[in-house]
Amino acid sequence: TFSENPVGAWELRQPARTERFTMQNKHLLSINDLSRSEVQSLFATAQELKSLRNKRIPHRRLEGHTLAMIFEKPSLRTRATFEIGIFQLGGQAVYFQPHDIRLGVRETVADVAHNMERWFDLIMCRVFTNQTVRTLAENSRVPVINGLCDKEHPCQALTDLFTIQEHMETLSGRTLAFIGDGNNVAHSLMLLCAKVGMDFNLACPPGYEPDPDIVMQAESIAAATGSHLRVSNDPVAMAKGADVLYADVWVSMGQEDEAQD
């Protein structure tokens, strides 16, 4: 967990036994599924587990548990990190390629969820649409993690800000400038930055602005945490004064036909 010092910066400290939080049986579909305190506790847990891994100390907290990894989109990092992560925690992952399931074609997304919940303790999906993620969660009694969809990429945002915090110690009052499309990554980052009190500047090409509904959600959160959100087509203006520059891919997955534009 974290404590707030007199100037408002969040400092990492070891959580007391009574302060342990639980996300048991909770889905992670969006950054909005997490409170600020849950984000802080996740970061503290991640730091603890990373320290154990670096010291080669076993931390098999998911001994005997299984993870289903459902992929409609290929990914090196998503598959590698989830598969290694569950292994280091003592569990086991099963990887499903697109042709293994064919979500919504060979059988409905709901039926897939009903089957998976009987065999697995946890489901991670990397899929085309947010509706697929939602349908899996609505029909599953085991937790579903959004490993990427067209609307959000919450796991990437969490690991990115955790890494930034490792280097800068505090996030509150810092500014992250994102240069790229207003896509799923930008959506999750702007929501998460707002939650932790970090300013977020987004520079995107005309016609590739973020979802207005998500911008409104982030602005509402930012108003409560004292952070600021700016969206512009001017990368130089958005990068000026930033503590972190974040550049995404120039052509988002699924938009390859627009590369020449």
Map each language-model feature to its residues:
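A short, aliphatic-rich alpha-helical micro-motif
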Residues: E117, A137, M238-K240
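Positively charged, low-complexity intrinsically disordered leader regions
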Residues: M23-A80, I84, E152
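Anion-binding alpha/beta catalytic cores of soluble intermediary-metabolism enzymes, centered on
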Residues: D121-L192
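Active-site-proximal loop->helix
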Residues: V94-M116, N139, L189-L192, P210-A224
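Active-site cofactor/substrate anionic-group-binding motifs, chiefly glycine-
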Residues: T66-L67, F71-W119
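Glycine-rich phosphate/diphosphate-binding loop of Rossmann-like nucleotide-binding domains
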Residues: E72-I84, E166-D248, M253
